């Protein structure tokens, strides 16, 4: 963990807001612009990262230095760890009580050999359950940058994110900012973005709570197709508005470390 420059949790108070999509695409984007990245999936009961990254058939193995991540590329710029890699069948449910989940999360934090990387993005399940307490407590031992909170524009999602803000404050976990996901719909034919839900909810919440608003991510059918098929969206659609949104998020980050990280291609 001490060899990882930036450690970021991705949280949401509600399921279905696209948190795993944000986590995976943020990791892919950072890798795309030259950083070395790790993506840790701690959603033990509903791991979706392996499918999104096209790694469903892969297995993880242990070395003398710990678990070795599954890499998406030969240059090993993006490594992934998920409970899915440890299950013999992707349809096998994880029926564990809290203590066993907590033990697994501790191993994910302490026993993975990420090597020297620039970013570790940690995708979490929705809510504020045992998993969140465990991963936050373990991560706070290693000076994390903080959490990115994901919401959709609707009031019901924003209400749940307020609880997530209270959770972060109670745990003394810094909040990097809020991302408003599903903010508008990108036409796959003309690329025009149209609001189909209410808008600005995430931005208003950020202003109310004095939290940085990182930006909006629209619904993009092409992104959805790539995630379903495990295809790298950025190589398929290099001029997309989604890529521009992710660049804006990264530009808006306030990193905890005083050392500036420089991407290398």
From Swiss-Prot:
Cited InterPro entries: Mrp-like_CS, Mrp/NBP35_ATP-bd, NUBP2/Cfd1_eukaryotes, P-loop_NTPase, YlxH/NBP35
Binding site for ATP: 13-20
Location(s), subcellular: Cytoplasm
Subunit structure: Heterotetramer of 2 nubp1 and 2 nubp2 chains.
Signal sequence residues: none
Assigned keywords, A-Z: 4Fe-4S, ATP-binding, Cytoplasm, Iron, Iron-sulfur, Metal-binding, Nucleotide-binding
Name listed for the protein in its UniProt record: Cytosolic Fe-S cluster assembly factor NUBP2 homolog
Single GO MF annotation: iron-sulfur cluster binding
Residues noted as binding [4Fe-4S] cluster in the record, renumbered to the chain: 187, 190
Cofactor: [4Fe-4S] cluster
GO biological process: iron-sulfur cluster assembly
Pfam families: ParA (PF10609)
Function: Component of the cytosolic iron-sulfur (Fe/S) protein assembly (CIA) machinery. Required for maturation of extramitochondrial Fe-S proteins. The nubp1-nubp2 heterotetramer forms a Fe-S scaffold complex, mediating the de novo assembly of an Fe-S cluster and its transfer to target apoproteins.
Major location (coarse): cytoplasm
Family membership noted in the UniProt record: Belongs to the Mrp/NBP35 ATP-binding proteins family. NUBP2/CFD1 subfamily.
Membrane in keyword set: no
SS bonds (residue pairs): none
CC terms in the record's Gene Ontology section: cytosol
Cofactor note: Binds 4 [4Fe-4S] clusters per heterotetramer. Contains two stable clusters in the N-termini of nubp1 and two labile, bridging clusters between subunits of the nubp1-nubp2 heterotetramer.
Gene encoding the protein: nubp2
